[in-house]
């Protein structure tokens, strides 16, 4: 059973998270365990202090090293991995998700707040992770991302085929999916999906997954060893007039968006 321990100043943020959807199911069936620890329980003095002004001056309060280390050491075991959630960390990607899910280590997730952590915390953790190049109020949402993504890959949580088809699992985005009605607003479900021909459907999905990846995340294909069939599909995709028009339109939109932002930032 995979165990997650979250160190946070705001335990109440996890109430809904733990009682909803896949996480609720995994907890109920004892496929995972989640323990929420309030860092203030390890605070200093009668005022439960966990932060202070930074040396050298500057805006914002800094989380103190003493309560953080005390909280971490109280939860660490020989089999645990301690993860600091910070925008300065390594980008969290699907390969890391798979690694965390595959090994037997329990995960301790340390959530920051305020201006950040006393830098000396780095001596007491194993990983620094970031879920993206943007700033959140604290690490709580990031810790939920880690728990959710790893839980999905834990044994018996969801159907194996479901997560194998997920975007990024094979360095491909997922193929388009449709449900009822067959027609809406003049837009139709592709005929091949209604044909009942399983081989043609599988080929269509492979083709469309490659197409979507090439348009939206082309760098993913650099990591992937393509089959002969996929190589043929990709060449066909690159030569599609309608597809190339869409790509030019997307690039034109992004160029205009960046141009406007640059103009706004320099005016």
Curated annotation (Swiss-Prot):
Residue numbers spanned by region Disordered: 245-267
Subcellular location: Cytoplasm
EC number: 2.1.1.228
Compositional bias (Basic and acidic residues): 245-259
InterPro entries listed in its UniProt record: Alpha/beta_knot_MTases, tRNA_m1G_MeTrfase_C_sf, tRNA_m1G_MeTrfase_TrmD, tRNA_m1G_MTases_N, tRNA_MeTrfase_TRMD/TRM10
Record's keyword annotation contains Methyltransferase: yes
Origin: domain of life: Bacteria
Catalytic activity: guanosine(37) in tRNA + S-adenosyl-L-methionine = N(1)-methylguanosine(37) in tRNA + S-adenosyl-L-homocysteine + H(+)
Record keywords, A-Z: Cytoplasm, Methyltransferase, S-adenosyl-L-methionine, Transferase, tRNA processing
Binding site for S-adenosyl-L-methionine: 112, 131-136
One of the record's GO molecular function terms: tRNA (guanine(37)-N1)-methyltransferase activity
GO cellular component, one term: cytosol
Keyword hit for S-adenosyl-L-methionine: yes
Gene Ontology BP terms: tRNA N1-guanine methylation
Enzyme class: transferase
Principal location class: cytoplasm
Assembly with partners or alone: Homodimer.
Function, as annotated: Specifically methylates guanosine-37 in various tRNAs.
Protein family: Belongs to the RNA methyltransferase TrmD family.
Protein name, UniProt field: tRNA (guanine-N(1)-)-methyltransferase
Native source organism of the sequence: Spiroplasma kunkelii
């Amino acid at each position: 059973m995979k165990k997650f321990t979250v160190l946070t100043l705001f335990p109440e943020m996890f109430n809904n998270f733990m009682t909803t959807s896949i996480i609720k199911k995994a907890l109920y069936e004892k496929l995972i365990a989640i323990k929420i620890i309030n860092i203030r329980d390890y605070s200093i003095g009668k005022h439960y202090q966990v932060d202070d002004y930074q040396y050298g001056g500057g805006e914002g309060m800094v989380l103190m090293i003493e309560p953080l280390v005390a909280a971490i050491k109280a939860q660490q075991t020989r089999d645990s991995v301690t993860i600091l959630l910070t925008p300065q960390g390594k980008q969290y990607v699907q390969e890391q998700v798979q690694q965390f899910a595959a090994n037997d280590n329990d995960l301790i997730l340390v959530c920051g707040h305020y201006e950040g952590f006393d830098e000396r915390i780095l001596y007491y953790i194993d990983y620094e992770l970031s879920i993206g190049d943007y700033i959140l109020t604290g690490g709580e949402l990031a810790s939920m991302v880690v728990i959710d993504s790893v839980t999905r890959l834990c044994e018996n949580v969801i159907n194996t085929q479901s997560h194998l088809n997920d975007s990024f699992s094979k360095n491909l985005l997922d193929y388009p999916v449709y449900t009822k009605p067959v027609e809406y607003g003049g837009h139709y479900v592709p005929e091949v999906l209604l044909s009942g021909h399983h081989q043609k459907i599988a080929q269509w999905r492979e083709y469309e997954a490659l197409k979507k990846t090439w348009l939206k995340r082309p760098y993913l294909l650099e990591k992937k060893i393509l089959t002969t069939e996929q190589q043929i599909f990709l060449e066909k995709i690159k030569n599609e007039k309608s597809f190339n028009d869409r790509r030019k339109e997307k690039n034109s939109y992004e160029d205009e968006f960046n141009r406007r932002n640059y103009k706004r930032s320099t005016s």
